[in-house]
Structures are given as structure tokens and as C-alpha cells.
Amino acid sequence: MKVPRLLLALGGLASIHIASALPQGAVERDMHATSAVVHGGNVKTKFPSTTGLKFTIDGETGYFAGSNSYWIGFLTNNADVDLVFQHMKESGLKILRVWGFNDVNTKPATGTVWYQLHANGTSTINTGPDGLQRLDYVVHSAERHGIKLIINFVNNWNDYGGINSYLQAYGGASNEDFYNSEPMQKAYRAYIKEVVSRYIDSPAVFAWELANEPRCKGCDTSVLHSWIEKTSRYIKSLDKKHMVTTGEEGFGLDLMSDGSYPFTYVEGGNFTDTLSIPTIDFGTFHLYPSSWGTTNDWGNLWVEAHGAACKAAGKPRLFEEYGVTADHCALEKPWQTTALKTKGVSGDLYWQYGDTLSTGPSPDDGNTFYYGTDEFDCLVSDHVAAIDEMEKHGRH
């Protein structure tokens, strides 16, 4: 999903100074504890995995519900992070997809969270308290609350830097330049290595994700395929414990195609070919009919087609993003129902999670619905209950 950076400022999250609701000593102990858990490495843990066409989490194999929160790693109040995970746990949500990137081309003002600076052909990773230590706390809190995280490494869109931030620093005019540039890929891989090494032993990591919605408009599909194959193989060389996926929207699919834009190869993706890459553990697809010029009812075909493709490939598929700007329950509930009935689709993460933080409501990009509302009851509480009922009777 493409989201504006301004939303963080509107949500009161981007401009406040780094501080915690806890006493400073407690913050330091929390961060040291995170380091011990994340880097410690001696305690044997069961990592999330695939089992046939399903996912296995904490020894339980089945269908899992979750959500997205691009903003949680940019929060500066530990208590807010804990609140989100506590509410997720109480609601039965198991997976949260978070932005593992926050790229800039100029160093922000003190107190603004940023993860990596690209300038003049060089990249600097921020491991300080206004950098990756914020993501450290997200992982730490997720571990304590039993929530699993999908962490991605770069954005297709310009929000929070994205591929464009690399192009601005290293030179280039298109996504294809990024995918094929040795200097840019070297910087990108250095960032991957830093993030993976921090959390390599964490049971909270569900999967590493190459990018948010990688595209290469007008490119031959071999460009994205080669980049996905090389990058996923590199991640697996660093970490054989955790799963790896792409973050793709699911574009480029002949199976059950009606010829509409999302099924075409115009954005450079070939879903079937991506699934064939051995170092990709499961597929992802997104759904935004209003952005793609399709109808809401069409979304059911999109879900079924990707389930069929994954079934044929012998890999599960995660319905990783879906959303609308109004009538959430009426429009999104049918997609959830279709996903539950479709073999090959083994989890879904709605876009996006909302909650009331110490600064007020979390950012709303128009697709957000909030904890404790009627929409939350419909699309989370009722959905989790439907999943439990389905798993109880072994119907998926």
C-alpha cells in the first residue's frame, strides 16, 4: 500500500523527541533485554514455517489472521507499542506486517525516527535510539506478546524513502536501474544484513520480505524474477531459520485470468514464476479494486486465482494486504469468506490496524479501522471466530 509520510506527522508520531512512558532505567533494561533476546542465540526456539499449503506458528498448523502497521516501528513511546500488541493478542490476531525500512536523503531533525541515510553515493545505517533501536523494541514487544512479524527492507513507493531514495543518492531514473545497479544492490544488501543479524534468533519474525509491492513497470518479467531470486538466496545465506517472501501484489497471472489489468504483466511481475523460486517460501498478494479499476466483487476472483496458483505450486499464499476506504465490513467481509474457503490461501492481513495511542488515534490513510469499533468486531473478532470454527472442523 502506498501511504503518505505526512500521516505520521498528522498522527503526532514523527516529530516528538525520543522518550518512553517508562523511566529511563527501565528503557535501558528493556533495550538490553531486547539485545539479549535478539542477539542471544542459545535458546532453541520453534520458528514459523510452512507445512504443505498451510503455515505453522508455535507448533500450530492452520490459517492465521493478522494486520499491517507501517507506523509501529516509528513510534517513540514503548507503552504505545506494547498497547498495540496487547490488543492484537486479546483479539486473536497473530501476524503483523511492519515497515523494516525508513530511508532518507537528508538527516532529519533530532527526535525524528529514521533507519538509513542515502547521500552522495553512500549509505549510513542508523542503529541509534532514533533508528533501528525503535525496531528492536517492536521485535522485543512482539516476542513478549506472542505476535509474529513480517519485516520488509525497501519500499516500491516514495513513502519513507523507498527505491527513489537510492536513485537520488546513487544516480538512476527507474526501478529497473535500482534492481540492476551493483552499488545500489550492495547498499540494499548491507541493510538487509544489518536487520537480519539483529533478529536472526528471534521467534517473533514470521518472515523476511524483499520489498513492499516491488514493481518494474514496462520491464521484462526477467528483471524482477532475477532480483527476487538473487536477493532471496542472499537472505537465506544469512538466515536459514526464517521464511522469506516477496511482498508482491500478485500481478502477472494467466490462471483464471479475465484479462483485467492486475492479471497482466505490465508491472513486470510473473506470479507463477516467482512461486517457482526455491528460496521463496510462500507467495503474497494484495487487493485494492478501487486503485486497480476493478469492482469489489472482482476481488473474490483475485483471491481464488491466487489460491489455485499456490495449490499448483505446492506453496501457501498469504493474502497480505486488502482494504477499502468506506463500508469496511460490507465490502471486505466477502473477501475474508472467500479466502477461508480457498485452498492455498492460508492467512490474511487486512490494511490496516488502528488504535488509540498516547498521542491520539494512530495514522489513518483512509483504509484504517480501529480497535474496539463495530468494524473491528466484524472484520477481526468475527473473522477470528470463523477461523477457529473452520480449524475445529478441519474444513480448510
Swiss-Prot record:
Native source organism of the sequence = Aspergillus terreus (strain NIH 2624 / FGSC A1156)
Ion transport as a keyword of this entry, yes or no, is: no
Q: Which residues does the Swiss-Prot or TrEMBL record annotate as the active site? A: E213, E321
List cystine links.
none
Could you tell me which InterPro entries the record lists for this protein? Glyco_hydro_5 (IPR001547), Glycoside_hydrolase_SF (IPR017853), MAN-like (IPR045053)
* Sorted UniProt keywords: Carbohydrate metabolism, Glycoprotein, Glycosidase, Hydrolase, Secreted, Signal
Assigned protein family: Belongs to the glycosyl hydrolase 5 (cellulase A) family.
Glycosylated residues: list them: N120, N270
Q: Which GO terms describe its molecular function?
A: mannan endo-1,4-beta-mannosidase activity
* Localisation per UniProt entry: Secreted
**Catalyzed reaction equations:** Random hydrolysis of (1->4)-beta-D-mannosidic linkages in mannans, galactomannans and glucomannans
Spell out the GO cellular component terms annotated for this protein, sorted alphabetically and separated by semicolons. extracellular region
> EC annotation?
3.2.1.78
Give the protein's recorded name.
Probable mannan endo-1,4-beta-mannosidase A-2
